[in-house]
């Protein structure tokens, strides 16, 4: 028993380190942190095997995908010189296996959510205050070169810090609401996180982050349907409506330009208008159009196996890029992993509120992965923090699979109750 507790504790510390590693700007840079991450996973794996880790067919396929990535990388680079370049794929599969291990055991990790939120609060406020003083830093932090290292080491993050929170946003909002009635301290931490997130996302002015957050919140609050696909179509409809309003309603466009004056969002609005007037994409929109065209061209050229070489697609689309680079197999593995959490909870807990949360969660995951890249920084939030948030909500509201079965039985019993008509005289 004591040994089992020790194994659990080692795993808890390992998971906490791994999630902090994925979200911390200062841990993005130096190799020492990556070595620490692989050491943490090694310790976790030893403990998991001791506790009875088992894999299903999908996990073996995911490991096969890692083997494919490694082989292609070695062939392309004539050796192991860039073996860590596709690190997000290694982390994605490892976290997928770890998340599967915790199904039915998520209570062991409940403690990490407030800790992660406290880290995020600090990073968000630090980053928001920095980009408020110098808005150009937000665009600089999207780049991947040594020029940004000074900022990262200070805890100032950009894309890799903000977007993992965006794809978790609707679940966190509902978690804060539920925590207010069940765990008041958690709720206070959550509200502080929400304030820091809003400040960061508004001042960083990443247009996809703002749009994805707003649309997912709209779906969470107002969409009551069953289908996540329909929810996504509704979101696309809202997106198209917004674009048409910007192009055709001068008052609305001017209001947005005034609100976002001097920011990247204002630049994108101007690029959109210029593209419409010239009949061709302009500025940053042109960059994205070229990237998406490159991805689509590669998918049509190599629909089965993909281009395989690094950056086969044009970029700016994680989902499209996986199909372009690794074909049907890679795209399938990405979808199974990246969308697994909301799909699982929507299937296992068919309660209306869980369905609403899962639909909003799927919409923002699809929106971001279709229109932007995904790095390993997403994976701690997507595959560890998000399921814990679902589990907290389910526990606080007393929603269990058994309860649902009881509800089904009750409904069947009501259906089968014989109706006795009153006797007539």
Ranges and model annotations:
Residues 423-425:
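Glycine- and aromatic-enriched alpha-helical transmembrane segments of multi-pass membrane proteins
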Residues 264-314, 328-332:
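TM-adjacent membrane-interface loops and short helices in multi-pass inner/ER membrane proteins
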């Amino acid at each position: 028993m004591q040994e089992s507790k020790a194994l659990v504790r080692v795993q808890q510390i390992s998971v906490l380190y791994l999630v902090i590693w994925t979200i911390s700007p200062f841990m993005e840079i130096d190799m020492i942190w990556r070595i620490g991450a692989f050491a943490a996973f090694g310790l976790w794996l030893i403990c998991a095997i001791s506790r009875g880790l088992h894999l299903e067919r999908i996990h073996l396929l995911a490991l096969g995908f890692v083997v494919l990535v490694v082989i292609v990388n070695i062939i392309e680079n004539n050796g192991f010189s860039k073996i860590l370049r596709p690190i997000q794929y290694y982390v994605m599969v490892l976290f997928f296996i770890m998340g599967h291990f915790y199904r039915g055991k998520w209570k062991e990790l409940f403690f990490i959510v407030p800790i992660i939120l406290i880290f995020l609060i600090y990073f968000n406020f630090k980053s928001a205050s920095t980009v408020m003083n110098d808005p150009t830093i937000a665009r600089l932090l999207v780049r991947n070169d040594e020029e940004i290292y000074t900022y990262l080491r200070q805890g100032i993050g950009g894309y890799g810090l903000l977007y993992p929170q965006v794809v978790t946003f609707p679940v966190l909002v509902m978690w804060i609401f539920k925590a207010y009635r069940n765990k008041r301290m958690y709720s206070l931490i959550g509200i502080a996180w929400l304030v820091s997130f809003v400040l960061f996302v508004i001042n960083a002015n990443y247009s996809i982050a703002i749009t994805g957050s707003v649309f997912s919140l709209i779906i969470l609050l107002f969409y009551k349907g069953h289908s996540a696909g329909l929810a996504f179509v509704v979101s696309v409809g809202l997106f198209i409506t917004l674009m048409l309003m910007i192009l055709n309603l001068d008052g609305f466009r001017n209001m947005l330009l005034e609100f976002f004056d001097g920011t990247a969002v204002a630049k994108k609005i101007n690029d959109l208008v210029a593209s419409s007037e010239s009949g061709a994409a302009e500025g940053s929109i042109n960059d994205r159009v070229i990237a998406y065209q490159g991805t689509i061209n590669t998918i049509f050229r190599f629909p089965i196996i993909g281009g395989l070489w690094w950056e086969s697609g044009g970029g700016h689309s994680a989902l499209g890029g996986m199909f372009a680079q690794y074909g049907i197999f890679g795209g399938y593995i990405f979808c199974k992993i990246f969308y697994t959490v909301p799909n699982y909870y929507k299937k296992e807990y068919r309660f209306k509120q869980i369905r609403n949360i899962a639909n909003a969660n799927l919409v923002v995951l699809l929106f971001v992965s279709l229109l932007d890249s995904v790095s390993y920084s997403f994976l701690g939030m997507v595959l560890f923090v998000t399921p814990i948030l679902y589990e907290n909500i389910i526990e606080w509201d007393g929603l269990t699979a058994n309860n649902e079965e009881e509800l089904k039985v009750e409904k069947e019993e009501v259906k089968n109750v014989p109706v006795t008509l009153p006797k007539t005289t």
